[in-house]
């Protein structure tokens, strides 16, 4: 099964599990917040007060759009609601599969979307100085900061990452989805219930990278390690090798031994006050926070020029 299909399957399982147990899952909770964002976005960009902006529209940039389902439900309404004569949509993701699936959808709908396969934290400029952009990062992707696995305060990493996002456009607003629930036991139980979301990276490797036939994406099991303080929580997503592997990727020989632990990525959650403080230091003004009782939040920021 491809990484994209495995991810979509995991999304469906989370939603089904929530319906059975009566609990709230991350996918559904964020969708509800995204719907609130759809209804308020024109107020954020002062749509009704600037005739030129209303005519030209606001371009949309999304970092890490993910699956077709996620794009349809969370991002597409923003693209449609903000479009104008010169506005455009740009999607940036590392996954060729995810971008390819959305490209088929956009073609069917007659949408003009630019697909860029690359690092979402590169700090690249995507828009000209005279373009206004609304930048979104759903799926708590922002929390996947590349920092060491220790209790070091992540403020510097958060500020620097926000500055990279700020560099995407001279004039922009940013909506970032993050987790706000700092309870470690809740986070550990949540991620343990859905290992497919983390292990899909190995299926993506098999499908998208030059890996030889000796690589087995099923040779890994998932374990979350959780650390943090009173303003942040860091989930260290770890893959444990279940059997010895000897394979070649891009001409380089790789040997993994049973029992080895691989640090896949991080998932950070932040308190509201901590994230706002980081936003100010990065040159943003917080203009809204959409939140719920399930530990999900979307912070809306405006770049200060």
From Swiss-Prot:
Gene3D superfamilies the UniProt entry points to: Vaccinia Virus protein VP39
Key words, A-Z: Plasmid
Top-level division of the source organism's lineage: Bacteria
Protein name: Uncharacterized protein y4iF
Originating species: Sinorhizobium fredii (strain NBRC 101917 / NGR234)
Lineage: Bacteria, Pseudomonadati, Pseudomonadota, Alphaproteobacteria, Hyphomicrobiales
């Amino acid at each position: 099964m491809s990484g994209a299909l495995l991810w979509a399957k995991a999304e469906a399982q989370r939603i089904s599990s929530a319906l059975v147990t009566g609990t709230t899952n991350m996918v559904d909770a964020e969708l509800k917040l995204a719907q609130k964002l759809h209804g308020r976005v024109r107020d954020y960009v002062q749509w009704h007060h600037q005739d030129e902006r209303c005519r030209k529209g606001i371009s949309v940039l999304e970092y890490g759009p993910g699956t077709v389902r996620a794009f349809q439900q969370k991002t597409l309404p923003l693209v449609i609601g903000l479009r104008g004569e010169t506005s455009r949509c740009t999607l940036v993701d590392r996954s060729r599969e995810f971008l390819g699936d959305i490209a088929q959808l956009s073609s069917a709908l007659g949408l003009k979307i630019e697909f860029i396969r690359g690092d979402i934290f590169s700090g690249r400029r995507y828009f000209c100085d005279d373009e206004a952009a609304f930048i979104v990062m759903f799926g708590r992707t922002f929390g996947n900061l590349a920092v060491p696995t220790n209790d070091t305060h992540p403020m510097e990493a958060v500020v620097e990452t926000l500055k990279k996002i700020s560099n995407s456009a001279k004039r922009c607003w940013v909506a970032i989805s993050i987790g706000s629930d700092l309870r470690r036991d809740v986070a550990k139980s949540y991620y343990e219930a859905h290992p497919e979301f983390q292990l899909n990276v190995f299926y993506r490797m098999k499908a998208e990278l030059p890996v030889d036939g000796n690589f087995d994406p099923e040779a890994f099991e998932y374990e979350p390690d959780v650390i943090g303080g009173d303003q942040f929580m860091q989930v260290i997503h770890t893959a444990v090798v279940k059997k010895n592997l000897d394979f070649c990727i891009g001409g380089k020989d790789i040997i993994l031994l049973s029992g080895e632990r691989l640090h896949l990525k991080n998932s950070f959650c932040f308190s509201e006050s901590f994230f706002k403080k980081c936003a100010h230091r990065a040159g943003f003004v917080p203009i809204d926070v959409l939140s719920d009782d399930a530990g999900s939040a979307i912070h809306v920021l405006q770049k200060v020029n």
